[in-house]
A protein has these predicted regions:
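Hydrophobic recognition helices of helix-based DNA-binding modules
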Residues: 117, 203, 264, 268, ...
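N-terminal Rossmann-like NAD(P)+-binding domain of SDR-like oxidoreductases, especially those catalyzing
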Residues: 1-185, 229, 239, 334, ...
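Non-catalytic, hydrophobic alpha-helical segments
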Residues: 231, 235, 249, 260, ...
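Conserved C-terminal active-site "lid" loop/helix of NAD(P)H-dependent oxidoreductases
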Residues: 228, 286-322
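Short mixed-charge
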Residues: 268-290
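Residue-level signal for the nucleotide or nucleotide-sugar donor/cofactor binding architecture
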Residues: 66, 97, 105-108, 146, ...
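NAD(P)-dependent short-chain dehydrogenase/reductase
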Residues: 139-142, 160, 164-240, 252-273
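Amphipathic terminal alpha-helices
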Residues: 4-7, 313-314, 325-346
């Protein structure tokens, strides 16, 4: 994908990963066609914040990936060299409320795009945004490409269906198809429904005196938090390879939600001390005796794997993948971005 004048198609371009990937590919000289949901105006704030909202080599088209005929028509018309399938239902919590919608949005859509590529651009490389949720509650850490797949949540199952479809089309039809097994990857462009952005925005508002505290769910859940631009660069590198494969993208370092909260508050020079257990735990600002973090079980997931941490050795070796921010740097970057946004909004 580093060759000029190549054309990449990105489903879900208005999301965090889609916008970051579009900026990366445009910077490499590629033409980019991004898809958005039909029947509504695309939300372009991320593209605009990245300075590419009106880029001359960026074109937006409406597409429902769950519509097989529409997928075939779009791929035939665009004739992309690479298809990055990033669209879909992206929140684990939402999948428990509507499992069928999650499976259709993530599983069926992948099959539709695989078939569209196979029929119309068989030499194109399809890259799927898979998920560490396909591992379920793994017995061993860290997880790699050979870790048994045992999805537990409906979201995990939907991603497992998509992941298995990519492997099947690769083996059965010789398609150039790869899956990026994405562990948690965050950035300034993360949606506010995700806990890391909820924290960065909440911390910014607390620092500005606009809020007093943040309410979270399970503080003990441990995740592997990376910086999203590193992950989309690895996906672009996957598309440039002659043959498809599966790649874990992760930092290899686990941190709890409590750790992320501590790092986010540290970015505004607030030190948290933690008291209590379970739903009674609170994070208190040292020296001010103010409760800044509370726990509410309403934010607990029905199932939450206690420890998810990835081994990205294959991606490091074959793609040159190298995480650039540690937890403190990631939290600081997100908080500083939200401080700037909140200051501008006054």
């Amino acid at each position: 994908m580093s060759a000029p004048h190549s054309c990449a198609m990105i489903t879900g371009i208005s999301g965090q990963d889609g916008a970051l990937l579009a900026a990366h590919l445009l910077g490499e000289g590629s033409d980019v066609v991004g898809t958005h949901r039909p029947g509504r105006a695309p939300d372009l704030w991320r593209l605009c914040e990245l300075g590419i909202g009106t880029h001359p080599r960026l074109r937006l088209v409406a597409l429902d990936p769950a519509d097989a005929a529409a997928c075939a028509e779009a791929v035939a018309r665009v004739q992309p060299d690479a298809v990055f399938h990033l669209a879909g239902q992206s929140r684990v919590a939402d999948s428990f409320r509507d499992p069928q919608a999650s499976i259709a949005a993530n599983g069926l859509s992948t099959v539709n795009l695989l078939e569209a590529v196979r029929a119309n651009v068989p030499r194109a490389h399809l890259v799927l945004a898979s998920s560490a949720e396909i591992f379920g509650a793994p017995q061993h850490a860290p997880q790699n490409e050979d870790t048994p797949l045992a999805a537990r949540s409906p979201y995990g199952l939907s991603k497992l269906i998509a992941h298995a479809a990519v492997a099947s089309w690769r083996a059965s039809f010789g398609l150039r198809a790869s899956s990026a097994i994405l562990f948690n990857h965050e950035s300034e462009l993360r949606g506010v429904v995700f806990v890391t952005r909820k924290l960065s925005l909440g911390v910014a508002r607390i620092a500005l005196g606009r809020e007093q505290s943040i309410t979270l769910g399970n503080l003990d859940a441990q995740r592997d938090f990376g910086y999203a631009p590193d992950y989309v660069a690895a996906m672009a590198a996957m598309a440039a390879r002659e043959h498809g494969n599966d790649y874990v993208l992760a930092t290899g370092v686990a941190a709890s939600i409590r750790d992320f909260a501590t790092a986010a508050f540290a970015a505004v020079d607030i030190v948290l001390d933690w008291f209590g257990d379970g739903v009674d735990e609170v994070g208190v600002e040292r020296g001010a005796d103010r409760v800044r973090v509370r726990v509410d079980p309403v934010f607990f997931r029905p199932f939450d794997a206690p420890l998810m941490v990835g081994d990205a050795s294959r991606a490091r070796r074959e793609l040159g993948f190298a995480p650039t921010l540690d937890l403190a740097g990631l939290a600081r970057r997100m908080v500083e971005a939200d401080l700037e946004r909140e200051t501008r909004s006054t």
